[in-house]
Each structure stands twice: as structure tokens, then as C-alpha cells.
From Swiss-Prot:
Species, as recorded: Candida glabrata (strain ATCC 2001 / BCRC 20586 / JCM 3761 / NBRC 0622 / NRRL Y-65 / CBS 138)
E.C. numbers: 2.7.11.1
UniProt record, GO biological process: budding cell apical bud growth; establishment or maintenance of actin cytoskeleton polarity; regulation of fungal-type cell wall organization; regulation of protein secretion; septum digestion after cytokinesis
UniProt-recorded name of the protein: Serine/threonine-protein kinase CBK1
Biased amino acid composition, Polar residues: 50-59, 178-217
Length: 773
């Protein structure tokens, strides 16, 4: 408030602001800095009586201002300088009746501006005899004026003249006593601005000095009561002054109305927000509330999250695989003594394959890219077709899965696990996956076509295997199961239907629909949480598991089959019936380990139980716990110690029976639980088997094909009499209707995309695979 642009004394008695009086027409300079000069110039007033009278009045005025200062600010504010009026020449002030002094007013009735620094003076020093610096006669006025103008031009631009304080060129300004008549004028210089600072000595003494000094910042102290007054502005024409007064009155009238319109709660909230912003140690906290968003927005956000995660996972995985292929080729080239030109050709060939693979990854496959040759298999959730790719003419087996049934039957985890197993290995013991894609209704797995059929077809055709043939197929099954376990998966559905025969007569495992890798995406609970399924949805569609959702198996429930095991003919009838059972929504529990039924946890050793059941069927002719009803089959499996028997009319070796009994036993006593596949390989039944070269050995049976599309080893005749499942038939009708209406089936819904994000896959070496016919 003090020491700023304007310095005024405030009269607490009448509420008026004290302003310095207008000076004589003679211009005065404020004291210069010590470097310029050490003397002050002043106009000597000849009337000594008026000077004495003025001095006495000034003493009274200083006492009154000191009292006003103490009353307004209190005794504690010692750092605030006391305000003193300027010391004008004699006769420039007039005394009014109440004893207070007010500046003289010009003819227009306006108080003259006090923006000029030259109006501020201390009490003048005493006259020093005939010293020309402090006195002059009337004849020296013009000479003194010239000297002042010359000094003003030499000093800094912040030295001003008294005439700059008068506004609008108002006429003559005459004081009350009429002794001084000043011709006012307004200066246009941009430097005519008030700039006054005070030194510490001035503040401590309570006297104002016109000496220019650097500003001294005082520490801010709280004021108990502060009075704000508007500083005087330069005079304006009467018309502009009236407009400003009207605007101020309107603002004052509108301010209470606006304050009354603001609710008290909002005012308090604003104050709290301002207080928090002013607090330097406060932090901003954000609360995540996705539940406030709509369901569609939440689904889209979840889809974006999964897509981003899958994108970076696949990108990193591809970069690692590409680097490994480069290192592998360079290592191979380094082991041969080939020329640099040949090595360069090999590296260039690899680079070309990498480029082709990148283009393939960017290509979106669809059902229209394949031509269906024949349906070679049907199941509960889809079917298997023999297809031919239109652009290359390659033959593949296409497995089609219905998305809606995956939701209803809680098969989302199993589908993801099957895709991960097929895409995560290049083992010769597992069916190769070349592509995988999807549309709005189906999931598609493009796999290699194995024309030899499956092991069930061979059992139906030959009924029994010899021990040598059984040893060969069981040895290859052990190597295939070992590969699955090394990948970190459990098949859980090893049966003759899932053991396929390739074109050379060797076996490969397929149908990993019930496999699990103990990954979060292989757990049914992961997809339940992802889709936020409630209890109503579970009751309407998904099965209500009695235990862990990841242990759910659709092959546990079977239809009742009336069987009598009196002769081989009836066994063949049972096998054909069981083939039909594989095409229906029910499955077969004949090869399931008892610990899976109990929901008490199981490990990889459950697959070795299934191996023992298949070995029993190859040597005896039927499964070890075959019964007329599924309940009886379940009872026999749970009581295997009493129900496992070997018929007397079928002769098998002691080693074969011992291996079967050691596989069909309790999990903690089962062969392979401690040492894995190596423990089974060391059994006497497999004595003489070369485990490293068994795949190069000629197989007991090599399928003979008439063409690459020959399907004689598949039960295509039986499939003609097997109707499509209701879900598949309904989906086919919906697809036809969508095509008629011009709707693209490839436009996926967001909800159905969530569990299948990342399902698309393309194999790198698809162009060089010899298994693709």
C-alpha cells in the first residue's frame, strides 16, 4: 500500500485524501543522486511571516497525522512509513475551519494530480546567507529557468516538471490567496510516471525523502483491519468521468445480486478447492470407477486392453523367433565349408521367406479362401472338413467350432488351450497347425491332413493287435504324451479317437479340446470373470460345475448303451455304437482317471491311466471298464481294484499285464508319477525299443491312398446318417439368412471377441511343410 506509485496521506476525520498542493510555475527538480550533485534547488520565499506561520501549521499537521497513523494501523506496524505531506512554498495551502489543510483546487474544480515526483519535499534547509544556490532575485528568474531546463535534459528521463501534473491543459490555476498563477499543461512524455522509493533511513526516521533508491521489500505481515482506497487517476473530460461513474455504480449494484445467486454450498466448495490448490503439499488423487460406465463401454475397453496385450506379446514373440531362425541358419552355414556366395544365397532365401511371412500375417483369411472337399468328422461343438486352399491347392483338415456352443458349454478355456498347444510346438508327435482365424459364428483351425484315419478305425477293422504292434503304437504314444507334458500341458482326453495315423503309418496326437496348461487363459474362471457372467447366465447356459471349472469335462455324461460281452460280434456292435457316441454331445468315460471324477486335483499322471486303458483295449478287444450303463462304468472305474480283470480266453504276456496293472492304479502308486515317461520306458515290456529312431522305423501298417483327397480310412459313410446337432443346424440357417440380407458374417460382436482375441495364427514355414499334401 505504501511506497508505491502514489503517496498520499489519508485524513481519517473527513475521509478525504491529502494531496500535495500545486507548485509555482517555476519548475523544481527532485534531488539528484550523489553522483550528480549534492545540492538542492528551491525557490526562496520572500515573505518570512507567511513562512513562520506555515511552519507552525506544519507541526500541528504532522502531530495529527501521527495520531491518525497510530489509530489506523496500531503500534505494531513499525515497518510502515509515516506519510507526510509535501512542503509547498508559502501560500499554497489554505486553512479551513476545522484546522485541516487541503490542497488548493484549480478553476475546473478538480484536484490536481500528484503523480509528479517533484511535489515531494522535505522541510527545506535554512537559508545560507547570500548563497546563490538557495536565493535569487526577481531578475534571475529567467536565468534560473534556463539552468533548470539544461539540468533536466542532462539527467535521467525520470526527472519531471511540475506542469505534467496538470490535466487537459486547464487554464490558469490560482490559489486562494492569489499570489501564484500557474499556466498548466499536460506532458506527453512516456516517462512522466510516478516512481518513488524510500530508503531504510527514511522509513526509520518517519520522514519522506525525494532521494531515489532501490526498492526494499518488507516481509508481509497480516493486517487486522485494512482499508482500501482507490488511488486518484488522471483527470478526464467531464463526459468520460460521468460514464465511468455510471459503470462503477452498475458494477456495485450487480455484485450483491451475483453473490446472492451463488449457493452457499458452492461458495464453500470453491473455498475448499482454492485452499487445496494453495496448499503446496497437497496431492491429486484419481479414483477409478469403471462401474459407472455403460456395459458396452466396459466391453470395448476390455477388448482394447486384450488386443494391446496380444499385439505386443505376438510382436515380441515373432522378433525372438525371427532372430532364432537367423542364428540357427548362420550356425548351420558355419558348420559347412561352403563358399561365401552360397552362404549369401541361403541368407537371402531366408530373408525372402521372412518377407512372405510378414505379408501372410497381414492377410486376413476367411472361409471363402478354402474349398470344402468332404466332411470327415462331426462332434458336439463342430465338425472336421477336408478342404483345399484356393490359391495354393494345398490340402488341409479344417476343424470348425461354433462360438455360441463354446459359451454355453463353458469350453472357452479348452478352445484356447487347444490352439496354444498346436501353435506352440513343431513336434512330429503333434498335429501341425498352419492357420487359425474366426468370424462372427465360428472358429477355424487349419491343420495338416492325416489320411490314415485314427486308431479307433484300425481297432474296428482288425479287432485285436498283437503285442508287437501294440508295443510299437504304445511306444509312440509315450513319446507323444511326453512331448505334451514337456510343453506344460495335460491332455486329459487320451483315447483311440484322438490318436491319428499319418501317411507313413506313424501316430500323432490331436483334439486338445480338454487339455490344460495351467495358464490363466486355460482356466474357465478366467473367462467367467472376463465376461462377468452372473448366476442367472450360469443357470440358463453354462453348466454348474461341482468343483473347479477348469476340470469340467463333457465326456463324463454318456447315454445308456445296452451291451452284452458274450461274443466278439457284440463287441464290434459296441465299437460302432461308441463311434456314434463320439459324434454326439456325450462322450466316453472309459479312459478317464478316477481322480478326475473326484475333483480332488490331478497331475500329468492322469494321462498315463488313459494309456493303460488303451493298451488293454488293443490286447483284449474292449476297454477295461466297459459296461451297459454310464453309471456302471463310473462305479467300475472308482472300484478298479476289484473290477479290473483279464479274461482267461485271451492270452497276454506277464510283462504286458504288469504294465497295465501298474498304469491302472492309484495316482500316488502309478508308474510315471515320479520319473515321468522315462520310468515307463524302462519297463520290461518295452525292452529292445530304440526310442531315438522309432519314427524312422517302418510302421506296421502304411495306408495306401489313391489320391491326396482319399478318405477311405474315415467313416464318411456313417457320417451321412448322422444328423447335425441342433446348434450347428441353427447356426447354418442363421448364416444363410445373413448372406441373403447382405450382412457380412465376419463382423464380430464385441462380447464374442473378448475370449478369442489372439486366436488368429499363421505358421512361418507353411510354404516348406512336407506334411501339407
Amino acid at each position: 500500500m505504501f511506497g508505491g506509485e502514489y503517496d498520499h496521506a489519508y485524513d481519517a476525520n473527513n475521509g478525504q485524501r491529502f494531496q500535495p498542493p500545486v507548485l509555482d510555475a517555476m519548475e523544481f527538480e527532485k534531488p539528484g543522486s550523489p553522483s550528480v550533485g549534492d545540492h538542492f534547488l528551491r525557490q526562496q520565499i520572500s515573505n518570512q511571516s507567511l513562512h513562520d506561520q506555515y511552519s507552525s501549521h506544519m507541526e500541528q499537521q504532522q502531530q495529527q497525522q501521527q495520531q491518525q497513523h497510530n489509530a489506523a494501523y496500531g503500534a505494531g506496524f513499525t515497518d510502515i512509513p509515516q506519510l507526510h505531506p509535501s512542503t509547498p512554498p508559502h501560500g499554497l495551502v489554505q486553512k479551513i475551519s476545522n484546522g485541516n489543510f487541503h490542497p488548493a483546487m484549480n478553476q475546473g474544480g478538480n484536484i490536481p494530480s500528484t503523480s509528479n515526483m517533484n511535489n515531494m519535499f522535505n522541510t527545506p534547509p535554512p537559508t545560507m546567507g547570500n548563497n546563490p544556490l538557495y536565493s535569487h532575485d526577481n531578475n534571475s528568474t529567467n536565468l534560473l529557468q534556463d539552468n533548470l531546463n539544461q539540468a533536466r535534459s542532462q539527467f535521467s528521463p525520470d526527472r519531471y516538471s511540475v506542469d505534467s501534473d496538470f490535466n487537459n491543459g486547464a487554464g490558469n490555476h490560482v490559489m486562494a490567496n492569489g499570489n501564484y498563477n500557474i499556466n498548466g499543461s499536460q506532458s506527453s512524455s512516456p516517462y512522466h510516471q510516478p516512481q518513488t522509493f524510500y530508503t531504510n533511513s527514511n522509513l526509520s526516521s518517519g520522514q519522506l525523502s525525494a532521494h531515489r533508491s532501490s526498492p526494499q521489500r518488507q516481509p508481509a505481515q497480516p493486517l487486522q483491519q485494512t482499508t482500501f482506497t482507490q488511488l486518484p487517476q488522471p483527470s478526464l473530460p467531464p463526459q468520460q468521468q460521468q460514464q465511468q461513474q455510471q459503470q462503477q455504480q452498475q458494477q456495485q449494484q450487480q455484485q450483491p445480486k451475483f453473490q446472492s445467486m451463488v449457493p452457499p454450498q458452492q461458495t464453500q466448495l470453491q473455498q475448499q478447492q482454492q485452499q487445496e490448490l494453495q496448499n503446496a503439499g497437497s496431492y491429486m488423487y484419481f479414483e477409478r470407477r469403471p462401474d459407472l460406465l455403460s456395459k458396452s463401454t466396459q466391453d470395448k475397453a476390455a477388448a482394447v486392453k486384450l488386443k494391446v496385450e496380444n499385439y505386443y506379446q505376438q510382436s515380441v514373440k515373432y522378433a525372438i523367433e525371427r532372430n532364432e531362425r537367423r542364428v540357427e541358419l548362420e550356425t548351420e552355414l558355419g558348420s559347412h565349408n561352403w563358399s561365401e556366395e552360397r552362404n549369401a544365397r541361403q541368407l537371402a532365401s531366408l530373408g525372402k521367406k521372412e518377407s512372405q511371412f510378414l505379408r501372410l500375417r497381414r492377410t486376413r483369411l476367411s472361409l471363402e479362401d478354402f474349398h470344402t472337399v468332404q466332411v470327415i468328422g462331426k462332434g458336439a461343438f463342430g465338425e472336421v472338413r477336408l478342404v483345399q486352399k484356393k490359391d495354393t491347392g494345398k490340402i488341409y483338415a479344417m476343424k470348425t467350432l461354433l462360438k455360441s456352443e463354446m459359451y454355453k458349454k463353458d469350453q472357452l478355456a479348452h478352445v484356447k488351450a487347444e490352439r496354444d498347444v498346436l501353435a506352440g510346438t513343431d513336434s512330429p508327435w503333434i498335429v501341425s497347425l498352419y492357420y487359425s482365424f474366426q468370424d462372427a459364428q465360428y472358429l477355424y483351425l487349419i491343420m495338416e491332413f492325416l489320411p490314415g484315419g485314427d486308431l479307433m478305425t484300425m481297432l474296428i477293422r482288425w479287432q485285436l493287435f498283437t503285442e508287437d504292434v501294440t508295443r510299437f503304437y504304445m511306444a509312440e504314444c509315450i513319446l507323444a504324451i511326453e512331448t505334451i507334458h514337456k510343453l506344460g500341458f495335460i491332455h486329459r482326453d487320451i483315447k483311440p479317437d484322438n490318436i491319428l495315423i499319418d501317411i507313413r503309418g506313424h501316430i500323432k496326437l490331436s483334439d486338445f479340446g480338454l487339455s490344460t496348461g495351467f495358464h490363466k487363459t486355460h482356466d474357465s474362471n478366467y473367462y467367467k470373470k472376463l465376461l462377468q457372467q452372473d448366476e442367472a447366465t450360469t443357470k440358463n447356459g453354462a453348466p454348474n460345475d461341482a468343483g473347479d471349472g477348469s476340470n469340467n469335462r463333457q465326456t463324463m455324461i454318456v447315454d445308456s448303451i445296452n451291451l452284452t460281452m458274450s461274443n466278439r460280434q457284440q463287441i464290434q456292435t459296441w465299437r460302432k455304437s461308441r463311434r456314434l457316441m463320439a459324434y454326439s454331445t456325450v462322450g466316453t468315460p472309459d479312459y478317464i482317471a478316477p481322480e478326475i471324477f473326484l475333483y480332488q486335483g490331478y497331475g500329468q499322471d492322469c494321462d498315463w491311466w488313459s494309456l493303460g486303458a488303451i493298451m488293454y483295449e488293443c490286447l483284449i478287444g474292449w476297454p477295461p471298464f466297459c459296461s451297459e450303463t454310464p453309471q456302471e462304468t463310473y462305479r467300475k472305474i472308482m472300484n478298479f481294484e476289484q473290477t479290473l480283470q483279464f479274461p482267461e480266453d485271451v492270452h497276454i504276456s506277464y510283462e504286458a499285464e504288469d504294465l497295465i496293472r501298474r498304469l491302472l492304479t492309484h495316482s500316488n502308486q502309478r508308474l510315471g508319477r515320479q520319473g515321468g515317461a522315462d520310468e515307463i520306458k524302462s519297463h520290461p515290456f518295452f525292452r529292445g525299443v530304440d526310442w531315438n529312431t522309432i519314427r524312422q522305423v517302418e510302421a506296421p501298417y502304411i495306408p495306401k491312398l489313391s489320391s491326396i483327397t482319399d478318405t477311405r480310412f474315415f467313416p464318411t459313410d456313417e457320417l451321412e446318417n448322422v444328423p447335425d446337432s441342433p446348434a450347428m443346424a441353427q447356426a447354418a440357417k442363421q448364416r444363410e439368412q445373413m448372406m441373403k440380407n447382405g450382412v457380412n458374417p465376419n463382423q464380430n460382436q464385441v462380447k464374442e471377441d473378448l475370449p478369442f482375441i489372439g486366436y488368429t495364427y499363421s505358421r512361418f514355414d507353411y510354404l516348406t511343410r512336407k506334411n501339407a499334401l
